[in-house]
Amino acid sequence: MALNLAQSAAAAACFATAGDARRAASVVAMPSSSSSATTSLRMKRQAACEPVACRAVARHVAAAAASSRRNGVPVFVMMPLDTVSKCGSALNRRKAVAASLAALKSAGVEGIMVDVWWGIVESEGPGRYNFDGYVELMEMARKTGLKVQAVMSFHQCGGNVGDSVNIPLPRWVVEEMEKDNDLAYTDQWGRRNFEYISLGCDAMPVFKGRTPVECYTDFMRAFRDHFASFLGDTIVEIQVGMGPAGELRYPSYPESNGTWRFPGIGAFQCNDRYMRSSLKAAAEARGKPEWGHGGPTDAGGYNNWPEDTVFFRGDCGGWSTEYGEFFLSWYSQMLLEHGERVLSGATSVFGDGAGAKISVKVAGIHWHYGTRSHAPELTAGYYNTRHRDGYLPIARMLARHGAVLNFTCVEMRDHEQPQEAQCMPEALVRQVAAAARAAGVGLAGENALPRYDGTAHDQVVAAAADRAAEDRMVAFTYLRMGPDLFHPDNWRRFVAFVRRMSESGSPREAAESAAHGVAQATGSLVHEAAVALRS
């Protein structure tokens, strides 16, 4: 007979490992009745993991897992991008969400991450917020016993790696951007990018009397007030969106309409009138007004490589000249100041005992990392070169606000990437980890692309958990919940991965052996989740 959701989750908890189950069973108080028949019946029920006895076992296993996680790295799982309907009033695929959350809980996952889309919640007009669909999700997570990382997603969904749905910015925001195209990031050829409002107008009251930063802060305040009863208990982290894909960066490598293709260097985004005005003032203050007319004109196009350009070439390119230093310092400083402004708003909302930590995501731009100029990082706003650490200033900015640095591409290995593009994700992760450590901020991680194989899991465990306590990541968020995750083989490996993370790097073989019981116990539940997610 198929188990229902609660029974499946309880059964999985019982079978998390054979050893855990045996140890847990040994502490369950047995009845004092002298009736051997009654005792036998109760023992059979316990062995079958029926709720009457299994709850005690499950509580013991959960407590053991929680204790283990204190020494390891908690794992969260990203929800589908379209978890909440575009009208904001309901969950999409409610049955699939319920089954999926129960399965994740059974695997020992700490919680979920969900995008709280500005374009959904405030779509009807300024200050008109509809969180109904998210309330349903939070209640479901609380009932299941999962924590939540809530992402304040102030960007458009669509046009980036992994974007499977389209969720634009709020309609009233888009209307203002259509009236004034300079509210959008703009490249040197006049191409506009509507993924995220240009940081150049952060302090301009361009949205019906409000600045963009005020819009973001008001949204976060509305979220806090609406979910006050969940904060600190169920909602344990607020990730603050800072740019395209929710990352603190410029939209320098947009995939939409084939503009950019990996591993192109991207393009600077500083040609809207607000950015040009700032650049002009900075150039005049430097005593070089001729530098204030726009960004470099010899930096190539989106799909060039560094050596194709004059600006990014070798040691003698424009990036290493006095002008290059001036421009790149200004460009990266504008991004840092944007982060300061938005984080100041976030801490004013969530900083007074709200109970949830704040985090910011930084992009893992690993291609051409082995070159001197690090061109793709420069166009994205990270002034990181062979001779300069571009991540330490970001980490220090986050430290001033007590925020966690969330970094991507943790699953990648150098040799898996095209070597001709000098991709070095492992070295990049090490550099960012060192910057976080030096600045005294917590480092969390994500995988940049969906991976379900043991090799990727090994890499994450090595980078995040299998190290000295002070160097471990504070959390890892797994991309992403979907039918592929619930494929039987993928699921078994994932359960083992979660166990290894919680135990700070236990061997893969032992973890996979222990995960076999969970995979068996949750088979029907996982199948239900996979089928429902495909519907």
Swiss-Prot record:
Q: Name one GO molecular function term.
A: beta-amylase activity
Instruction: Name where it's found.
Output: Plastid, Chloroplast
Q: State the reactions this protein catalyses.
A: Hydrolysis of (1->4)-alpha-D-glucosidic linkages in polysaccharides so as to remove successive maltose units from the non-reducing ends of the chains
Record GO cellular component, one term: chloroplast
Q: What is stated about pH in the biophysicochemical properties?
A: Optimum pH is 5.5-6.0.
Q: Which UniProt keywords apply?
A: Carbohydrate metabolism, Chloroplast, Glycosidase, Hydrolase, Plastid, Polysaccharide degradation, Transit peptide
Q: How does activity depend on temperature?
A: Optimum temperature is 35 degrees Celsius.
GO BP, sorted A to Z: polysaccharide catabolic process
Question: Which amino acids does the record list as binding substrate?
Answer: 115, 155, 163, 361, 366, 408, 447-448, 480
- The principal localisation class reads plastid
Transit peptide span, please give it.
Answer: 1-36
Enzyme Commission code(s) on record: 3.2.1.2
Q: InterPro entries, per this entry?
A: Glyco_hydro_14, Glyco_hydro_14_CS, Glyco_hydro_14B_pln, Glycoside_hydrolase_SF
The catalytic site is made up of: 247, 446
| UniProt KW Transit peptide keyword | yes
What family classification does the UniProt entry report for this protein?
Belongs to the glycosyl hydrolase 14 family.
Q: What does this protein do?
A: Possesses beta-amylase activity in vitro. May be involved in cold resistance by mediating the accumulation of maltose upon freezing stress, thus contributing to the protection of membranes.
What this protein is called in its record is: Beta-amylase 1, chloroplastic
Tell me what organism the protein belongs to.
Oryza sativa subsp. japonica (Rice)
